[in-house]
């Protein structure tokens, strides 16, 4: 699930993804945007 957070590395997506989807969510940075894996 893409969220509206810009990124340049996967680490930048972990906090926003966990905030949006809970502690077990993961995140990746794809084409400059965060993609979360709830």
UniProtKB/Swiss-Prot annotation:
Function: Blocks human voltage-gated potassium channels Kv1.2/KCNA2 (IC(50)=0.3 nM), Kv1.3/KCNA3 (IC(50)=8.3 nM) and Shaker IR (with inactivation domain removed) (IC(50)=12 nM) and blocks intermediate conductance calcium-activated potassium channel KCa3.1/KCNN4 (IC(50)=6.4 nM).
Upper classification of the organism: Eukaryota, Metazoa, Ecdysozoa, Arthropoda, Chelicerata
UniProt keyword terms in alphabetical order: Calcium-activated potassium channel impairing toxin, Disulfide bond, Ion channel impairing toxin, Neurotoxin, Potassium channel impairing toxin, Secreted, Toxin, Voltage-gated potassium channel impairing toxin
Domain of life per record: Eukaryota
Record keyword Secreted present: yes
Family label: Belongs to the short scorpion toxin superfamily. Potassium channel inhibitor family. Alpha-KTx 02 subfamily.
Protein's name in the database: Potassium channel toxin alpha-KTx 2.15
CC annotations in GO: extracellular region
Disulfide bonds: 7-29, 13-34, 17-36
Other facts: Negative results: does not block voltage-gated potassium channel Kv1.1/KCNA1.
GO MF annotations in UniProt: ion channel inhibitor activity; potassium channel regulator activity; toxin activity
Annotated site residue numbers, Aromatic residue of the functional dyad: 37
Subcellular location field: Secreted
Tissue: Expressed by the venom gland.
Site-annotated residues for Basic residue of the functional dyad: 28
Notes concerning its domains: Has the structural arrangement of an alpha-helix connected to a beta-sheet by disulfide bonds (CSalpha/beta).
SUPFAM superfamilies recorded: Scorpion toxin-like (SSF57095)
Species the sequence originates in: Centruroides tecomanus
């Amino acid at each position: 699930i893409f969220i509206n957070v810009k990124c340049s590395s996967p680490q930048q997506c972990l906090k926003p993804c966990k905030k949006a989807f809970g502690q077990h969510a993961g995140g990746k940075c794809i084409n400059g945007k965060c993609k979360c894996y709830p």
